[in-house]
C-alpha cells in the first residue's frame, strides 16, 4: 500500500517464496505480509470508493503474484476502526466524509485474489490528548476520557498518548466486544494482535488497580491481566466463529516481552490463549543480543501446546541498511544480500515451525 510498493515487491521477489499460493490460512507453510494503517493513508485519505478499490486490487494482485497467501490488515491502530464499528471511531486516516467500508473492500478484493485475511488489532494503544479531545462522544473511550473517575484508571497516559488499562473488566469487555463485532460482521480468516501490551514498567501506570487487587508481585499480576485480555479476545473469536484463527505477534526476545508483561511462554504452552504465535524476529544471524538461528530455536522450544502453531515474522526493511542496535552484526544487512533467503531456508528446515 505504500509508495515504494514496487521497490518492496522487487526486494521480496528475491526471497525464494513458495511458487504455489493457496487461499487458506492453515497451510503447512504460511507466508504472509503485514499492512499497517499508515500504509492505507496514501490510497484512502480523500479518495473515492472506486479509487480506493482500484488501488487495493493492484496491490493485492502484486502480493498474490509473489506467492504470499495471507495479508494481516491493521484495522485498529489507535482506538479507531477501519471498518464499521459501534465501539470505535472511524480510522484516523479516513476522511470525515468517507462513505465506504475500507475493510469490506479489502476483504472482498483479498479473497478474490486468493488471499486469506487476518484483521490486525492493537487492543490497548489509544490516542494523544489532541486526538482524544476530537473523538466523538458516542464512543466508550471518549466517555472514559471525559470522566475524571475513569481517566487515570481505566484510561492511563504513558508518554504522549493514552492507553487502556487491562486490569479492569470493563476495559477487557470493550476489547472483547470489538473482536466479536469484527468476526460477526466480516468473513475474516483470523484476528491478530501484536506486541503492544503494557507500555511502561512504571508502577504509577496501574497503582490504584494493583493496590485494590491485594497482590504482592506486580510482575506476575500484570502478566495475569495480559492473560485475561488475551483469553477474552480468544474466547470472543471462538464463541462467534470457531473456524476463525486468533494469533499473537509478540516481540522477538523474551526480555522484550517481560518488559511488557507479555506471558508468551504460557500462551505457547497452554490451550485457550491463541491458535498461533508469530514472534517478530527482526534480527540477522550476527546480531549480538538475539542472533537469528538461536532465537528461532528458542521459540521452537517455547511453543509446545499441540493446539498452538509457531510462525516466524521476519523483516525486509533492513536489507542494505545499517542495523544500529545489532552490536557485532551492525553491518550484516549491508554486506550480505542473502540474509532473508538464509533465514527462510533455516526456518523451512527447523522442527516446530
Indicate where each model-derived feature is located.
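Aromatic- and acidic-residue-enriched segments that line the glycan-binding/catalytic groove
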Residues: 83-95, 125-157, 195-214, 328-332
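Aromatic- and glycine-enriched glycan-recognition loops and surfaces
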Residues: 47-66, 91-113, 224-229
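Active-site-adjacent "subsite" loops/lids of carbohydrate-active enzymes
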Residues: 23-53, 118-119, 124-181, 185, ...
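Aromatic-lined carbohydrate-binding/catalytic grooves of carbohydrate-active enzymes
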Residues: 66-100
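Polysaccharide-binding and catalytic clefts of secreted carbohydrate-active enzymes
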Residues: 52, 69, 104, 146-270, ...
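Substrate-binding cleft of secreted/luminal carbohydrate-active enzymes
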Residues: 269-291, 298-353
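Catalytic domains of carbohydrate-active enzymes, especially glycoside hydrolases
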Residues: 54-80, 185-190, 272-276, 347-353
Amino acid at each position: 500500500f505504500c509508495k515504494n510498493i514496487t521497490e518492496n515487491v522487487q526486494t521480496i521477489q528475491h526471497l525464494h517464496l513458495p511458487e504455489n499460493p493457496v487461499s487458506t490460512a492453515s497451510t503447512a507453510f504460511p507466508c504472509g505480509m503485514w499492512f499497517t494503517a499508515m500504509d492505507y493513508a496514501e490510497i484512502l485519505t480523500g479518495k473515492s470508493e472506486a479509487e480506493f478499490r482500484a488501488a487495493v486490487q493492484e496491490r493485492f494482485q502484486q502480493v498474490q503474484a509473489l506467492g504470499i497467501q495471507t495479508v494481516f490488515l491493521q484495522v485498529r491502530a489507535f482506538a479507531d476502526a477501519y471498518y464499521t464499528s459501534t465501539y470505535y471511531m472511524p480510522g484516523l486516516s479516513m476522511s470525515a466524509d468517507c462513505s465506504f467500508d475500507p475493510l469490506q473492500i479489502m476483504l472482498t478484493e483479498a479473497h478474490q485474489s486468493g488471499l486469506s485475511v487476518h484483521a490486525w488489532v492493537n487492543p490497548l494503544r489509544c490516542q494523544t490528548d489532541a486526538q482524544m479531545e476530537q473523538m466523538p462522544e458516542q464512543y466508550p473511550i471518549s466517555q472514559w476520557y471525559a470522566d475524571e473517575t475513569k481517566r487515570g484508571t481505566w484510561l492511563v497516559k504513558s508518554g504522549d498518548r493514552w492507553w487502556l488499562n487491562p486490569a479492569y473488566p470493563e476495559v477487557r469487555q470493550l476489547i472483547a466486544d470489538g473482536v466479536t463485532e469484527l468476526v460477526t460482521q466480516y468473513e475474516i480468516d483470523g484476528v491478530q494482535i501484536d506486541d503492544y501490551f503494557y507500555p511502561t514498567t512504571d508502577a504509577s501506570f496501574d497503582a490504584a488497580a494493583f493496590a485494590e487487587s491485594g497482590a504482592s508481585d506486580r510482575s506476575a499480576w500484570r502478566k495475569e491481566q495480559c492473560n485475561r485480555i488475551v483469553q477474552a479476545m480468544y474466547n470472543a473469536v471462538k464463541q462467534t466463529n470457531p473456524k476463525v484463527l486468533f494469533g499473537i505477534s509478540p516481540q522477538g526476545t523474551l526480555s522484550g516481552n517481560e518488559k511488557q508483561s507479555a506471558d508468551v511462554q504460557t500462551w505457547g504452552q497452554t490451550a485457550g490463549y491463541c491458535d498461533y504465535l508469530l514472534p517478530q524476529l527482526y534480527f540477522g544471524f550476527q546480531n549480538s543480543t538475539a542472533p537469528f538461528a538461536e532465537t528461532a530455536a528458542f521459540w521452537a522450544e517455547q511453543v509446545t501446546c499441540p493446539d498452538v502453531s509457531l510462525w516466524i515474522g521476519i523483516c525486509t526493511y533492513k536489507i542494505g541498511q545499517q542495523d544500529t542496535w545489532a552490536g557485532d552484526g551492525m553491518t550484516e544487512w549491508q554486506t550480505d544480500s542473502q540474509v532473508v533467503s538464509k533465514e527462510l531456508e533455516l526456518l523451512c528446515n527447523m522442527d516446530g515451525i
